[in-house]
Structures are given as structure tokens and as C-alpha cells.
Amino acid sequence: YNGQTYVDTMSKEAIAEFIRITHERYFETVGDEFGKSIPTIFTDEPQIFMMETLKFAEDKSEIRVPWTTDFPETFKETYGFDLTEKLPEIFWDKQNGEISFARYAYHDHTCERFAEAFFDQCGKWCKEHNIVLTGHVMEEPNLFSQTHALGEAMRTYRGFELPGIDMLCNSVELSTAKQAQSASHQYGREGVLSELYGVTNWTFDFRGHKFQGDWQAALGVTERVHHLSWYSMKGSAKRDYPASISYQSPWYKNYSYVEDHFARISTALTRGVPDVNVAVIHPIESYW
């Protein structure tokens, strides 16, 4: 974090100050174009904290878990008991396989504080200023990664007007796209955004671009944010997560072959109403 620390994303006060020194400055400078030539604000990989665990029961290592100043007070208001009296249950399993409600409640409250402080506040500000909040959270793919960094991904999507995902390294993460699409449907949003093609290298050809875009479109992605177009590739920039979808790539003038295809698909996907008759229970809370 450039020699500093990460912001406390569970603190409403901290995020309100973040909005004041960033979003408000954007509004002062280019607010007349909000909702016009500047349709969205993109947030990239917000997270709580990379939660750590002991490697074994008698491990003496120092580990870190998400916390904020008034966490014990808001926890007690929500669940009716003092978490500090149950702290060992966050780190160690109970005997005889007994499930710890305190551990579940800790993860639940951590995620809710995160969603309220960051996404609810940022989303509210964006609505009040006629601009769409979009972007994606950190570590979306599976139950472990979400618990590790977020609590859960789907709860955070409520603050987005356009929920998004990130697909790096030519990965295929079906549940990542599907849970974002599901949240978009449930919250009444118009589509799903994907940041895609990051870390695919200079050799990634149009077949790869089409494949990645096709399977994501099939799972509900309607808006594409390309990673990325460089201003310059001087110095070490030329090794910074290529390729550049711009003049640095010899094929950039032919890229319309790819984008014309997805423009037609997106048009079709955004002109209908989802007809969903199957419900799948997301097991993230059971994982906690």
C-alpha cells in the first residue's frame, strides 16, 4: 500500500472520508459529465482484510483477522452476546465437531459491516450524483477465497448499480460469473460487467478473446471492461500484465472483429427479461 496501510473498509467514518477526498473531487471537477460522457465510477478489488488462520492448534505464529474499533459493540447489538468472551472459537474448533455459532456470527458481522460501510455508502453517493457504481471485489471465485477476503461476494453486490467480476489469466470461473448474474437479477440491475483479458500476455490471440467473452456472455455478462490500454510501455511498463489492447499490439486496428461480435450479443442480452425457474442455494454461510 505504498508504505502505508489499507483503509478500514468496515468503518463508515473512514469510507465517508474516502468518498469526500476522492468522489467529491471528481464531482467538483467533472461532475457536469456524470451520467453523460462519464457514466460510471469503477472500484477495483475492495476487500476487508486477508484473514489468516493458525496452521495447527498449537501454532505460536502471529496472525491477523478483520477487526474495527467499535466491532465488539455493534456485534453485541446485533447478536446479543459479547464476542470477546468467545474469541477462542474464531481460531480453534470446538470439541466433538460442535459448530460454533460465534464463528459464524463473526464472519456474518464482518461481511455486513464491510457491505454497509463501503458498498452501501459508495452506491448511495453515486445514485445521488447521477453516476453508476461498478467494478468488482477481491477474491470472488470460491468459498475459501471469499471468506478469506470479503465474507461473501454476493452481499457486496447490493451497492453496485452494475455488479462486476474480474477474470484473469484466461481462467474459467463459472460460479464467479453466475453469482454476479444472480445478484444482478435479484437486485433488479440491468446487467453484469466483467474486467477481462488481464494477465493473458502478448501471445493471447483473437480465439482466446472470443472464447473468454463467449462463455461469460452465456452466464450473463453484458458489459466488457478490457484489461487494458496503455498510455505508454516505456521502461518496466512493458512487462506489466500485457497485452495492451491498443497501438502497442499489431492487431489493434482489427479488433473490431471481436467487439462487433460482442456488441451484437450484448444488445440481445439487454433487450429481454430473465426467465429463471431454478434456485440454487449458495453455501457460503455453511462454509463459515
Predicted segments, located by residue:
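Carbohydrate-binding surfaces of carbohydrate-active enzymes
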Residues: 28-40, 45-288
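Catalytic and substrate-binding clefts that recognize carbohydrates or anionic sugar/phosphate headgroups
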Residues: 1-32
